[in-house]
Amino acid sequence: MKNSADITVLGAGSYGTALAISLASNGHKTLLWGHDPVHMQTLAQDKCNQAFLPGIAFPDCLQIEADLAKALAASNNVLVVVPSHVFGTVLEQAKPLLRSDARIVWATKGLEPETGRLLQDVARDVLGEQYPLAVLSGPTFAKELAMGLPTAISVAGTCPTFTNDLVELLHSPKRLRVYANDDFTGLQLGGAVKNVIAIGAGMSDGIGFGANARTALITRGLVELTRLGEALGANAATFMGMAGLGDLVLTCTDNQSRNRRFGLALGKGCDVMTAQAEIGQVVEGYRNTKEVFTLAKRLGVEMPITEQIYQVLYQGKSPVDAAKELLSREKKSETPAQ
């Protein structure tokens, strides 16, 4: 079946829209679908996503499509960019409408709610083994990507041909550098864990602990990510790349990050509900914390920072008490014997 579009993007929030803008700016005919018909009608009329990316005009190659069946019929390349807690639901909706030659990539960062499973497992449960799968991950703020500011990301998947095609589709010499990676598991995990650590970094700064504490937290957060990744069979080197260290540093240090701002509010004394309300958009790290904590417990992986953040978010511990507990842990070597 011939494509009438080069790629269809499912998810018209800030990041989905930004990726669609980037693709269309590359000259690729791009369809953008969202679940809210009223929102989609507004996007089509305004030629801009005023709700999430105000003032950034849509390229001519970007088309708004409110009908999911039409959106999925237009292209065999499908990019899913929805919150992790509805990832499986969106795939369920899409499944009967997918083309037989469909190829699925997602930029969703997170794990399955309650179980802590990787999204590749969710996708396989819903879609079976029929379709090539891939994940896009790395240090990307939606606004900067949509504005065309230089950005770099990584992509990995189950099919090398699909991965290479995505590199060609996404890469732009002027705005977006894309690295191929063969660690499908590692790329997915980095996007979830960095959200958790970013909340911790925000809490630390909100309390007023300073740059030393923030840097220590980021560094030890990277250790926790690597431990968990290795337990799942990921390549430790992945976490020194875009989807690991890159995304971790970005999210922990810049206030464009909702997760960091959420942590800042908590550190300054807000309760969880008030802090979430202040952000006004989905704070993926809130759910991710429970998911990552659940996964770590199931695998027997020590993640003390994640555990303390979990206790703040779900058990009512104060950020100050969480910090005290981390600082009073038993002394140990930074390079334990293997």
Swiss-Prot record:
Binding site for sn-glycerol 3-phosphate: 109, 138, 140, 194, 247, 257-259
Keyword field contains Cytoplasm: yes
UniProt-annotated catalytic positions: 194 (proton acceptor)
Localization terms from the record: Cytoplasm
Annotated gene: gpsA
An example Gene Ontology CC term for this record: cytosol
Keywords linked to the UniProt accession: Cytoplasm, Lipid biosynthesis, Lipid metabolism, NAD, NADP, Nucleotide-binding, Oxidoreductase, Phospholipid biosynthesis, Phospholipid metabolism
Protein's UniProt name: Glycerol-3-phosphate dehydrogenase [NAD(P)+]
UniProt main location, coarse: cytoplasm
Function text: Catalyzes the reduction of the glycolytic intermediate dihydroxyacetone phosphate (DHAP) to sn-glycerol 3-phosphate (G3P), the key precursor for phospholipid synthesis.
Family annotation (Pfam families): NAD_Gly3P_dh_C, NAD_Gly3P_dh_N
